[in-house]
A protein has these predicted regions:
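Conserved acidic catalytic loop of the alpha/beta-hydrolase fold
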Residues: 148-168
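Conserved hydrolase catalytic core segment
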Residues: 167-205
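Alpha/beta-hydrolase-fold enzymes
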Residues: 190-274
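Active-site nucleophile elbow and catalytic-triad environment of alpha/beta-hydrolase enzymes
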Residues: 283-299
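Short beta-strand/loop motif that positions the catalytic acidic residue
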Residues: 303, 309-311
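Conserved loop-alpha-helix segment in the C-terminal half of the alpha/beta-hydrolase fold
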Residues: 313-336
């Protein structure tokens, strides 16, 4: 198997998505699924003027990049009834979902979220993809955004630019899963349902927070980082990526993919080389630091939308032995929590992007989900 093939398999099992599908900045670009999922959809940008962050910092212009597939449909009252927004994980983009394994299983004709019936919205979060981010030029002077800022921006993209006043469903993976909970208590009537996958609705602590802190410290403590004003990639980013790999990987998946010493060395080197070639250190820092004040747990009683909450037993980011998902799900009477058992089809934390594993649960949820 080639290094490229190994890398594609590896990236599919991790929460961080490949950014090979780049954005068309400045102009909307439309293609159809017939051209291949990697080129599907309409891309565009919404520029918010004088955006104020929770920190009090401001940007004169905040660019929000997005991809849409399908057409919004309104009822007699003008309420959009078929919009589904899917929120990506840390380091990913909206177009991360445009793969055969994901879009082909969900958006294709006759599939669960057939884009002929649904209006699919795939935003790039602040600091990610084609949206405004530190590497655009401000570097470490970029505003210190949080998940609350990212959700506020998503809401403005929908309501002010796309003219979507209601969502049938909000899906989210990893960071997007956490954004889903923030959406649920910040805009509780905006959606019919939530489908957050691979997170917990509580502050990031314990091993999860420790690894994130070590990864960020690996960059900040590197003299080559130069306070964010580096001219070449600081080596500390490689150490940070190693920690990310440890956090996101799953023993069974990695043993299957790399059953020999040489294969294991080849896989990890290919992964690290690819990440170093496509990741900016400041963007990485901001993306992980954005979770610093995430904690929806005090507001769970405000979440009134039904939710299908799914984690997998081989997720090392959200290990099931902690019992946290069950504990917090019990605080939300309209939330159904499912812990997927480990199988050859699960992918650790990356199971969040494997519709073949959880698709039937989502089908049952959508079938029973009332309009609000």
């Amino acid at each position: 198997m080639s290094r490229a093939s190994l890398l594609r398999i590896l990236l599919s099992s991790l929460s961080i998505s490949s950014s090979a599908a780049t954005a068309s900045v400045g102009n909307a670009q439309t293609t159809t699924p017939a051209a291949g999922w990697a080129r599907a959809g309409t891309q565009g940008d919404f520029v918010v003027t004088d955006f104020t962050f929770r920190s009090g910092e401001r940007l004169p212009e905040l660019r929000l990049h997005y991809t849409t597939i399908g057409t919004p449909q309104r009822d007699a009252r003008g309420i959009v009834r078929n919009a589904v927004m899917i929120l990506h994980g840390t380091g990913g983009t909206g177009r991360s979902f445009l793969s055969t394994a994901y879009a082909g299983e969900l958006f294709a004709p006759g599939k669960l979220l057939d884009s002929a019936k649904y209006f699919i919205v795939l935003p790039d979060g602040i600091g990610h993809g084609g949206s405004s981010k530190p590497s655009d030029g401000l570097h470490a002077r970029f505003p210190k955004y949080t998940y609350d800022d990212m959700v506020t921006a998503q809401h403005r993209l929908l309501t002010e630019h796309l003219k979507v006043n209601h969502l049938r469903l909000i899906m989210g993976t990893s960071m997007g899963c956490m954004h889903g909970w923030v959406w649920g208590h910040t805009y509780p009537e905006f959606m019919d349902g939530l489908a957050p996958y691979a997170c917990v609705p509580a502050q990031i602590a314990g091993r999860n927070r420790m690894i994130r802190t070590m990864a960020m410290d690996a960059i900040r403590s590197d003299p080559a980082w130069k306070g964010g004003e580096y001219t070449s990639t600081p080596p500390g980013l490689r150490a940070a990526q190693m920690m990310l790999y440890i956090m996101s990987s799953a023993p069974l998946v990695q043993q299957t993919q790399a059953p020999t010493r040489d294969k294991a060395d080849s896989v990890i080197r290919a992964y690290l080389d690819a990440r170093m070639a496509t990741t900016d250190a400041n963007d990485f820092l901001y993306q992980f630091d954005a979770s610093r004040d995430y904690d929806p747990s005090p507001n769970l009683s405000r979440i009134t939308a039904p939710a299908l909450f799914i984690n997998s037993a081989d997720d090392q980011v959200n290990p099931p032995e902690l019992g946290m998902a069950e504990r917090y799900a019990a605080m939300m009477p309209r939330t159904k929590f499912i812990l997927l058992p480990i199988t050859p089809e699960t992918r650790g934390h990356g199971t969040h992007s494997a519709p073949k594993v959880w698709g039937e649960y989502l089908r049952a949820f959508l079938t029973a989900l009332p309009q609000r």
